[in-house]
Amino acid sequence: FDQRRLPVPKVLAVSDDELCYLQQDLGSVSLFDALKGGREAGGRYNVKEKELLIRTIRQLPNVQIRGARGLDFTQCYPQPEFNTDSVLFDLNYFKYCFLKTTDIDFNELKLEANFRMFANDLTEEKMESFLYRDFQARNIMLDAKGNPWFIDFQGGRKGPYYYDLASFLWQASAKYSHKLRRELVYEYYYSLKNYTEVPSVRHFAQRLSLFVLFRTLQVLGAYGFRGYFEHKKHFIDSIPPAIQNLRELLHDNKFPYPYMVEVLEKITQLPQFAMIEQAAANRSDGYKVTDKNIYPAHPQDGPATFSKYDGKGPLVVTVYSFSYRKGIPD
């Protein structure tokens, strides 16, 4: 990665026995820290925070595509490649660590058949790209200029680039709005064009939805294990937002796995996973957060204008202009 000048920390020195090494200090500010205001405000990100997200998502194809060139994937641990076996492992992790804890009755054989169809679809397109595996805001450091640097990619392997995009944008705790996700997918797609051939927008969106579904089930399996079996409250609290992602995903897409979808819909209907609407906290930086509609206007009036600090308006702009009828005088 260093040879390709990717935004990753440089290894400065390695001990003779290769058990210790020194690497570049990237500071203490992560993207997760920088996005705290928008995250705690219920997903209402300001312009600066959105710019950080755009910078990050534009750099992701650089790591995925250029980072894969000349990389010996046989050295990747614990898996050299994203394959059917690893997908089935994660799907069964979801089944045993989450689904079975809900006491929903389901047919094991029918669900397994759909799992195999799903796994085959996820792995049918072979790609020469680096799958970061744990691409999240906590693993992105920011320098003084706000440029992203990537860490904790040691679990990476060869695999489809859709996976990392799904992991990043559909992380439940981030609370990204549908509009913001769409904008960031757009930024990623057009950045990807700079590094490799890309499929049509329609095909890209269809493939991405499969990986969003897979990543959601994978996350629920992890939350189930950490929360229900290891009794860690943070992971239990993270389950309802993840279920909401699943609920929206099933509503917006038609997946060709009828029995699996049937079981997943039963999960989303369970009362313990109902989303409880919480009022967003006011931001410490003065960015206005309100549950009210601050855009009241007649459609013919054009877009509304308002102050982000008090939600009041309209903004009045007076324009003065002049011209020289016979040109600029001498």
Q: Which residues make up each language-model segment?
A:
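C-terminal accessory "lid"/substrate-recognition subdomains
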Residues: 291-330
